[in-house]
Amino acid sequence: MKNRFLEADLIIVGGGSAGCLAAIRALELKPDLKVVLFEKGDIKYSGSIARGMDALNIVAIPNFTTPELYVEAVSMGCAGILDAPASYVMAKRSFDLLKKLESWGVYFPVDKAGQYRTLQYHAKGRFLTAMEEPNLKTMIARIALDKGAVAVNRVMGLEILMDSGRAAGVAGLNVRSGELVVCRAKAVILAAGGTARFTLPNSGYLYGTFDYPGNTGDGYVMAYKAGAALTGMEFSRRTLLIKDANMPLLAITVTRGGRVMDIFDNIIMENECHSLSRMEEAFAQGRGPLRIKLSHLKPEVIEEIEHILFTTERPVQERFFKGRGVDFRKSDIELWPTECQLCGGHGMAGVVVNEKAETTVPGLYAAGDVAAVPKQHLTGAFVFGEVAAERAVQFIANNESVMLDQGQVKVMEARRNRLADTSGREIDVRDIEYKVRRLIGDYVVSPKNEYKLKRWGEWAERFRDELEKGVLARDGHELSKIYEVEHIVTCASLSATSALERKESRWGEAHFRTDYPARDDKQFFCHMVVAKGESPEHIRVTTKPVIGMDGKEVRS
């Protein structure tokens, strides 16, 4: 298997929402900058919005709502465990982002008075702003490429290259050929998404996940190995979605008057989407399956919902519902809890960053689902993609070139070759992934307790040994799957270790410990922070105080 060497000023890992916006912003600021993107899929149709999007979940529209109110609302949704400065910056920049998207041709509906269509999503304020853009991903990818960014498709990130404690580039793997792709760069932006393939979805399909199945925690693991801190990893989120399809629709249907009902026809949620814990409680109490009722709505509202669902984010829904014989005017939509995931966009897990998208490693920035800006959604990916680019461009201007650590590359090359050697290996990589994710569901996610979390530690050691010595890679694609499963195992260990130390229950089903069922603000009103210890297998856990709008520590 070959090696390929590249040079860049800035390398971005991940060509999704955050990655594309980072590339665009960097080249707006410095058009002659050499920007390279590593993308596991194809930049045109990859990431969590492979097609289009129906809304910006967070826009603080001037004279209508405020960034301060958004911070208050999202803090409530995070049970207080939220650093305000980053969320404030995101909300403050959100309206300018909307206007920028409009200038690119993105359509945001307005009423007869020229006001944007806003919907109730958060506990306070109407920040969710309707958008109808079925070609959003191809649009931002095209703009990034037109400005001069170079997309290296089919390459997953493996490690951050280091030079005297500073990020100095990225080494990745071509997911088809197994080629090692090494790019030296003066700054690195991680935008590689969360961990979608964490537990198994209820359908049983390995890749039938709610979020982009290419997201296997690559960015989390790269940051961790480079010495960066992560937080919120104990927040293992799942939601109730369309049964068997695992596609999102709550923010589209419920905010427009749809009703989430239990089997006794009690209304669980209506006209807002911030009460997800009530859905979890109803299902846990045996009042499921839950369903969304739309038949009571006016015909024009149902038509609007159909138009959005069938044309924008996941158009395959039209074929799915037709195949199931579901007509929203007559039939309800059945919901079911799906797989757990780790994610900074919908959840709280990610690389520790400040309001400047800076990690704890010089020259390394993070944006989007890989970054711990809780519940930032698409707005956060776009805003912090830009913020990361702005800081990276400034860092590049103020710092000298970096050296390529040939020793680090040789170690990676030797391991790649060892994993690709088929002799003595017979375990199918799909089989071990299934078992890994099944046991994550058994031991790592809620309901949690000390025994289960420690049992995962024992299994993780066994899985690491099997991945190193027994899993067969018949081609470059299967080789990339070995690395993906290894990343899933590492993410599960980070999650379990963090959950073990948070000896309380918080965030509903996202972190419920049967041995510590109560919330304990006195001891655990703080961030759990994990970082690499003496070796990658040794996870060090510390706590970090919650930071308020004034930059000072917040007490419960």
Model regions: which residues?
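Short, well-ordered coil/turn residues at beta-beta hairpins
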Residues: 14, 185-187, 191-192, 367-368, ...
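Conserved redox-cofactor binding core of oxidoreductases
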Residues: 45, 97, 102-187, 191-201, ...
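N-terminal Rossmann-like FAD-binding beta1-loop-alpha1 element of flavoenzymes
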Residues: 10-37
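An anion/pyrophosphate-binding glycine-rich loop and adjacent beta-alpha core
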Residues: 222, 228-342, 391, 395
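Glycine-rich loop(s) and the adjacent beta-strand/alpha-helix scaffold that form part
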Residues: 190-247, 378-391
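Conserved FAD-binding subdomain of flavin-dependent enzymes
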Residues: 43, 61-107, 225-232
